[in-house]
Amino acid sequence: NVVYRFGHSMLNETVDRFDPNFNDQSMGLIEAFLNPLAFDASGTLTAEEAAGSIVRGMTRQAGNAIDEFVTDALRDNLLGLPLDLAALNLARGRDAGAPSLNEARASFFAQTGDTRLQEYANWEEFAFNLKNPASIINFLAAYGTHPSITGAATMEEKRDAAILIVMGGAGAPPDAVDFLKGQNGWCAQSSGLKDVDLAIKSVGGKGVPDVIHASLMPWE
């Protein structure tokens, strides 16, 4: 249910195509998706010729990184509608009963004994294993249970609260370090870390070819 979606983060804004003379016939990602007649130029190309133009283009196109980011066309304009593919993927996973990130890691560790697959004990450990360290702000804003986050009314306020927890400074809560380190009353269960979705399509992790790293924030 989750594994195949890693490719969503690799897509970019165009479907590159070249005719046999290498004239550029590229299309925008959403335009190509919504216009199947363009595949064979409304029947003027054979299936082989149409596929060939895509092969010539896509084999020369660099994909986006496998990470927690999704190109704008999929994040803001899926199917030509104001839909977010990343958020839909998270919802599908939950509906299908996909485990959380830590639940999956615990299962993989039990099966393999590989200590690299143990559950994350706290937010600090989780952040250390992110490919993009600054993304911890978004994960905290989405999943963190610190009162300064849960008490915030808007997405911007939640991110501001998360920034204060991570960066410190004036206005930072006195238990910010305890919250991040999972100590003095805070742990993976109580801090919200246990709720981070498993979303392999948006590999947030580094190191192990981590089919068990985390999810994309719907607003990222």
Indicate residue ranges for each PLM-predicted region:
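Terminal regions of secretory-pathway proteins
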Residues: 1-220
